[in-house]
């Protein structure tokens, strides 16, 4: 599986994508704290 950030993983062999919500909520929280300026 490939990890794309924000809790998102994709499995190319099996053609499915899933989200690790523990990771996602932490990373989204960091983005919120840092603001959207970096993007």
UniProtKB/Swiss-Prot annotation:
Gene3D superfamilies: 1.20.5.130. This is Bacteriocin SRCAM 602. Antimicrobial activity is lost upon treatment with beta-chymotrypsin, proteinase K and papain, but not when treated with lysozyme or lipase. Thermostable, activity is retained after incubation at 100 degrees Celsius for 15 minutes. Stable from pH 3.0-9.0, inactivated at pH 10.0. It comes from Paenibacillus polymyxa. Keywords: Antibiotic, Antimicrobial, Bacteriocin, Secreted. GO terms for cellular component: extracellular region. Its main location: secreted. Belongs to the bacteriocin class IIA/YGNGV family. Bacteriocin with antibacterial activity against C.jejuni. GO terms for biological process: defense response to bacterium; killing of cells of another organism. It is found in: Secreted. InterPro entries: Bacteriocin_IIa, Bacteriocin_IIa_dom_sf.
């Amino acid at each position: 599986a490939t990890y794309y950030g924000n809790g998102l993983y994709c499995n190319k062999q099996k053609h499915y994508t899933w989200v690790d919500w523990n990771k996602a909520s932490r990373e989204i929280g960091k983005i919120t704290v840092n603001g959207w300026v970096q993007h």
